[in-house]
Amino acid sequence: MGSIDAAVLGSEKKSNPGKATILALGKAFPHQLVMQEYLVDGYFKTTKCDDPELKQKLTRLCKTTTVKTRYVVMSEEILKKYPELAIEGGSTVTQRLDICNDAVTEMAVEASRACIKNWGRSISDITHVVYVSSSEARLPGGDLYLAKGLGLSPDTHRVLLYFVGCSGGVAGLRVAKDIAENNPGSRVLLATSETTIIGFKPPSVDRPYDLVGVALFGDGAGAMIIGSDPDPICEKPLFELHTAIQNFLPETEKTIDGRLTEQGINFKLSRELPQIIEDNVENFCKKLIGKAGLAHKNYNQMFWAVHPGGPAILNRIEKRLNLSPEKLSPSRRALMDYGNASSNSIVYVLEYMLEESKKVRNMNEEENEWGLILAFGPGVTFEGIIARNLDV
């Protein structure tokens, strides 16, 4: 894409004709709220594990994640019905998918309804659906069950993104942006939904990396409505979406590795991931900002909606880009309140971004109109979108 029109760079914050905008946000969570301080004892009791070294390691990890609360689908009722999920080595993929397929649909429908309510228009005005999940596997896919659950028209066009991991929310937003800008009058529902049950396992000395996921990841769903040329009577755009790019790093595909096995998904997260992101994030951001015609902008003159993959990743990004501490506050808050919720997290970050931008406006401080929406996932893949905050 070319540089941003000079008129758009002025002080008047109206959406640019033909540009995709985020018109509403919504979220949903399962009923089980987990306090991080009680997680270790509960997890080891549930899985009947008494290994003191593993318990000490998980205790240390829980203290370093900065997570305070998370929501999870897993419950005593589920384990009572499927006790094999907490036993090492059993073939449980069928049971897991039965639980996950239903759970992600339920959460996606709830988040979408909340989003549509915030949007204020009729559900019949939705023309396209982009559905993202790394927590289910079935034919037909969750996109159809979401459309069915919402009562969408059979004519609704659907796109399905499976197993995109933590970059899925921004990848879905990029796809929704392209749909909205190439189909005048369209309104795209982007829904993301994730649950960790697909990879829930008892602790094992053979899989020490599993404990990182136990300490960090959470469940939930997110939703957005995306469309261009908002109706000034009934729509209030939140963010305008400009340049969007994707980049994968060659020879890093084993850094975030997931395999669907008889025991569910086995994840391996390399310790090198934070360093890999730190080493490559600046060049990626320069490329993104340059394509948008904003190379003159200082990083601290922009907002940063970054997927909260973990505190180490956020700390390294902050250090490498020399960002002021408040720049990643929305990401850190999302991590603290919801954990790393994979593709959903960017919705939660954007909600906090809007909340904090309103506080800045009320305090008569400098507003950051332009910014970046970033996420990192398997590949290692970088996703980035230049956005304009229209709500400040």
UniProtKB/Swiss-Prot annotation:
One annotated Gene Ontology cellular component of this protein: endoplasmic reticulum
Subcellular location: Endoplasmic reticulum
Binding-site residues, CoA: 57-64, 269, 309-312
Expression sites (tissue/organ): Expressed in flowers and flower buds (at protein level). Mostly confined to anther tapetal cells.
S-S bridge residues: none
Comment on pH dependence: Optimum pH is 7 (at 30 degrees Celsius).
Binding site for substrate: 218-219
E.C. designation(s): 2.3.1.-
Sample GO molecular function, one term: tetraketide alpha-pyrone synthase activity
Pathway: Secondary metabolite biosynthesis; flavonoid biosynthesis
Any Gene Ontology biological process: polyketide biosynthetic process
Consequences of knocking out this gene: Pollen exine layer defects. Reduced accumulation of flavonoid precursors and flavonoids in developing anthers. Plants lacking both PKS-A and PKS-B are completely male sterile, with no apparent exine, thus leading to pollen grain collapse under vacuum. Altered pollen-stigma adhesion.
Enzyme class label: transferase
Chief place of localization: endoplasmic reticulum
Domain of life: Eukaryota
Coiled-coil segments on the chain, per record: none
Active site: 166 (nucleophile)
Sequence similarity: Belongs to the thiolase-like superfamily. Chalcone/stilbene synthases family.
Functional summary from the UniProt entry: Plant type III polyketide synthases (PKSs) that catalyzes the condensation of malonyl-CoA units with various CoA ester starter molecules to generate a diverse array of natural products including long-chain alkyl alpha-pyrones. Accepts up to C(20) chain-length fatty acyl CoAs as starter substrates, and carries out sequential condensations with malonyl-CoA to produce triketide and tetraketide alpha-pyrones, potential sporopollenin precursors. Favorite substrates for are midchain- and v-hydroxylated fatty acyl-CoAs (e.g. 12-hydroxyoctadecanoyl-CoA and 16-hydroxyhexadecanoyl-CoA).
Protein name (database record): Type III polyketide synthase B
The species this protein was found in: Arabidopsis thaliana (Mouse-ear cress)
Lineage: Eukaryota, Viridiplantae, Streptophyta, Embryophyta, Tracheophyta
The encoding gene: PKSB
